[in-house]
A protein has these predicted regions:
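Conserved alpha/beta-hydrolase "acid-adjacent" motif
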Residues: 104-110
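Catalytic histidine neighborhood in serine/cysteine hydrolases
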Residues: 118-135
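C-terminal, loop-rich substrate-recognition/catalytic regions characterized by aromatic stacking residues
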Residues: 139, 143-321
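Short beta-strand/loop motif that positions the catalytic acidic residue
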Residues: 91, 97-99, 103
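Solvent-exposed loop/turn segments at secondary-structure junctions
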Residues: 9-12, 102-104, 134-135
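Accessory cap/linker subdomain of secreted extracellular hydrolases
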Residues: 2-90
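Active-site rim elements
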Residues: 75, 132-142
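Loop/turn elements at helix/coil->beta-strand transitions in domains of secreted/extracellular proteins
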Residues: 2, 92-95, 122-126
Length: 321
C-alpha cells in the first residue's frame, strides 16, 4: 500500500556512474555493483547453504562484473533495466520519501527525481529533505518524523481517515540556518519567484588546466580540507575558474536543483570537469554530523531500549564557506 524510501537509490547507473565516469559513493572508491552484490549476499553466512550455491553464485557475479562494463562507464540496456524511474508507470503504492541534502553516498538527486516521477503521475507522494547525510531520522529531535509516519501508516495500512494527505505537507525541507525550521511547500522546487544571479568572473581567462599537481593536494596525507579551501577561496589558479555573484542584499532561498551549462574544448583525449555552488561569508554553519542532546529520551515501547534524541552539530568557529 505504501513505501518509505529513506536515502534510497532510484537509478543504479546514477549511483555508480556519471556521464560515462566511474563515480562510486564518497569513501567507497573502487566499489561497483558486483562488489555490493557480494557484500549483501547473506547466504554466505551459512556455510552449508552457501556450499550448495557457491558455483552458481560465482558465475552470477562474473556476469554482473561483465555487464556493468566498468571500462567504458557507458549507460546500457543492462543499466536501463536497473533504472526504477523507467518503471514509474508501474508504481501502485503511495510514497513517503526521506533524504539528506548532505548525503554523498546516495545523492539527493535520487530522491528528487523519484518525487518528480511520482508527482507527474498523480501518485500520492510526500518528500522530506533534512540537512544530514546518509542516515535515518527517527531520532532527529524536532523533526516530528515519527508522528507523521504514524499518521501516514495508519491511513495507508489501516484505512483510517485521519487527513494524512492534508495534514502532512507535500514537501518539507529543513532549513540550513535553523534546524528547528522546516519549510513546507506543495511541490518541489517551491516556486515563489525567481531571480537569476549575475555571475562575474573572478579572473578574465577562461582557460584551466586539469592538473592535480598544480593544487595543494598531497596523496601522502589527509589534506582534503586544505585542498577544498584553496579551490574555493584562492582567487586565481590554473586548475579552476571562479565566478561570483554580487553580494546578496536580502535573505535568499535556493529551492530546487541548480543547473550549470557551459561549452568547453579539450586538448586531451579525456578530462574531468565538475562545478559546485558555494556560499561565501563568515558564518557558524550547520554540519551533517550529529550529537546526542537527550540520552534515553525516546521511549519506543514496552520491553525495548530507550533511544537518544539527536541534533545536527553547529560549527564552533565561523567558517569562510
Amino acid at each position: 500500500e505504501t513505501i518509505i524510501p529513506e536515502a534510497a537509490i532510484s537509478n543504479w547507473y546514477d549511483y555508480y556512474r556519471c556521464n560515462g565516469l566511474n563515480l562510486p559513493a564518497i569513501g567507497w572508491q573502487g566499489d561497483d555493483l558486483d562488489i555490493l552484490a557480494k557484500y549483501c549476499f547473506s547466504r554466505a553466512k551459512d556455510p552449508e547453504d552457501y556450499a550448495s550455491v557457491r558455483e552458481a553464485y560465482a558465475a552470477w557475479l562474473e556476469g554482473i562484473a561483465a555487464d556493468e562494463d566498468r571500462d567504458s562507464g557507458n549507460y546500457s540496456r543492462w543499466w536501463d533495466m536497473r533504472n526504477y524511474l523507467k518503471a514509474a508507470d508501474r508504481f501502485k503504492a503511495s510514497v513517503f520519501l526521506v533524504h539528506g541534502l548532505a548525503d554523498w553516498n546516495v545523492k539527493p538527486t535520487h530522491c528528487v527525481n523519484l518525487f518528480a516521477a511520482m508527482e507527474s503521475r498523480g501518485i500520492p507522494c510526500k518528500m522530506m529533505l533534512h540537512q544530514g547525510g546518509h542516515i535515518y531520522i527517527h531520532d532527529l529531535q524536532g523533526s516530528r518524523f515519527n508522528e507523521m509516519l504514524h499518521l501516514w501508516l495508519d491511513h495507508w495500512l489501516y484505512g483510517i481517515e485521519n487527513g494524512a494527505a492534508e495534514r502532512i505537507p507535500n514537501v518539507l525541507v529543513q532549513s540550513n540556518l535553523d534546524q528547528d525550521l522546516w519549510l513546507a511547500s506543495p511541490s518541489f522546487p517551491a516556486v515563489k519567484g525567481y531571480t537569476e544571479p549575475v555571475l562575474m568572473p573572478a579572473q578574465a581567462s577562461g582557460r584551466l588546466v586539469d592538473d592535480l599537481s598544480a593544487t595543494v593536494y598531497d596523496r601522502t596525507r589527509d589534506n582534503a580540507a586544505e585542498w577544498l579551501a584553496e579551490l574555493v577561496l584562492s582567487e586565481r589558479h590554473a586548475h579552476c575558474l571562479r565566478y561570483i555573484t554580487a553580494p546578496l542584499e536580502t535573505d535568499t532561498r535556493i529551492s530546487g536543483t541548480v543547473q550549470v551549462s557551459f561549452r568547453a574544448a579539450c586538448r586531451a583525449s579525456t578530462a574531468i570537469l565538475s562545478a559546485m555552488l558555494v556560499e561565501l561569508g563568515e558564518e557558524c554553519r550547520l554540519t551533517p554530523e550529529q550529537e546526542v542532546v537527550q540520552a534515553g529520551g525516546i521511549p519506543w515501547g514496552n520491553n525495548t531500549p530507550l533511544g537518544d534524541w539527536k541534533r545536527f552539530r553547529l560549527e564552533e568557529k565561523p567558517s569562510a564557506f
